[in-house]
């Protein structure tokens, strides 16, 4: 039996990598589309040897994009996390790193026309219902990938791509502080539950018997720590309006400690069971936001300045992630960040016709 060829762009977005598809090049939403995405990535084989996934949650990601019918957006973007070692596709969250590639994809595929040295692309994030605006560098009417901006976790330099968000608070949980408190206690551990684009549970590393400066490999090998984190996560899912999270990748769990390298706060994130080599975009936004909230577990560890526009550097195992937060009379109004993206290939990805024969003609 032959193979089905699906048009695809493989792109690095921020510190992640994923397959970018036009909505109409895939089956309609449902079990068939999920089977196609699993086949594309090679899941549930833990090595993903028969697909284009990289045997890592950071490289087993998909963006599904189409022209938007909304007045306030140019394109609609649906993020799919293809679980590496399970036959499961999770649509329950955004990915701000993969988001960084959506604007360039829209221009590469002709969904948006270039306009000047920088082209704004308004992106409706279907997973959570929020709008982001990506300023894509478009020298000479084309996406400009080369530049001198460096982000931690990515070798080399590339063109800066600025992404801003007006209102992502409570995107998944319905409120910035979904439990209604800046601090809660679960199983004897003080936590802050926050959702400023990503549901995150923040904990002081020392309360879990670690420093928070350990390498990811050390934390990965600590089965007692991971068991305790998961017990806390499962209890907090319903309290964060997320329901049963046993089969979901949210909320993320994030261990905090005082900054070591001149940043605002130091982090070790779990997504949800593996220690992240850096930190997700929206995870960093939620952590940075918590640093400004009175009574949060982050506030006592964080080093912050005053003012209505604050830059907070979230330290992580690969370096730091800087988030700019805007405030008005002490109330958080918006946030922005700098990412980079790069087109890796433009072609087709092949799957067996026994999985899907392709779109009807």
From Swiss-Prot:
Belongs to the PrpF family. It comes from Pseudomonas putida (strain ATCC 47054 / DSM 6125 / CFBP 8728 / NCIMB 11950 / KT2440). It is an enzyme of class 5 (isomerase). The lineage of its organism: Bacteria, Pseudomonadati, Pseudomonadota, Gammaproteobacteria, Pseudomonadales. GO terms for molecular function: intramolecular oxidoreductase activity, transposing C=C bonds. This is 4-oxalomesaconate tautomerase. Its EC number is 5.3.2.8. Disruption phenotype: Does not prevent growth in 5 mM gallate medium, but the mutant strain grows poorly at gallate concentrations lower than 2 mM. GO terms for biological process: gallate catabolic process.
């Amino acid at each position: 039996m032959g193979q089905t060829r699906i048009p695809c762009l493989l792109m690095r977005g921020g510190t992640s990598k994923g397959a970018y598809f036009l909505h109409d090049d895939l089956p309609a939403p449902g079990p068939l589309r999920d089977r196609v995405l699993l086949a594309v990535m090679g899941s549930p084989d833990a090595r993903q040897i028969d697909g284009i996934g990289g045997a890592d949650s950071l490289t087993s990601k998909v963006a599904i994009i189409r022209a938007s019918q909304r007045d306030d957006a140019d394109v609609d973007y649906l993020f799919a996390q293809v679980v590496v070692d399970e036959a499961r596709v999770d649509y329950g969250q955004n990915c701000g790193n993969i988001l960084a590639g959506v604007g360039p994809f829209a221009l590469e595929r002709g969904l948006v026309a270039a306009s000047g040295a920088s082209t704004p692309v308004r992106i409706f994030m279907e997973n959570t219902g929020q709008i982001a605006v990506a300023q894509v560098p478009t020298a000479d009417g084309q996406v400009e990938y080369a530049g001198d901006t460096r982000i931690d976790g990515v070798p080399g330099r590339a063109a800066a791509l600025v992404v801003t968000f007006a209102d992502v608070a409570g995107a998944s949980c319905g409120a910035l502080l979904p439990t209604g408190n800046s601090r809660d206690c679960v199983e004897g551990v003080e936590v802050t539950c926050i959702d400023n684009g990503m549901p995150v549970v923040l904990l002081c590393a020392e309360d879990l018997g670690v420093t928070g400066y350990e390498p990811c490999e050390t934390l990965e090998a600590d089965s007692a720590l991971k068991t305790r984190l998961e017990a806390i996560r499962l209890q907090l899912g319903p309290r964060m309006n997320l329901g049963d999270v046993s089969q979901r990748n949210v909320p993320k769990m994030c261990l905090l400690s005082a900054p070591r390298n001149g940043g605002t706060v130091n982090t070790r994130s779990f997504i949800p069971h593996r220690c992240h080599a850096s930190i997700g975009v929206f995870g960093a936004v939620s952590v940075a936001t918590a640093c400004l909230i009175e009574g949060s577990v982050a506030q006592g560890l964080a080093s912050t300045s005053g003012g209505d526009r604050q830059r907070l550097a979230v330290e992580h195992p690969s370096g730091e992630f800087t988030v700019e937060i805007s405030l008005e009379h002490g109330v958080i109004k918006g946030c922005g960040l700098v990412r980079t993206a790069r087109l890796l290939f433009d072609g087709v990805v092949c799957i067996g016709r026994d999985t899907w024969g392709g779109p009807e003609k």
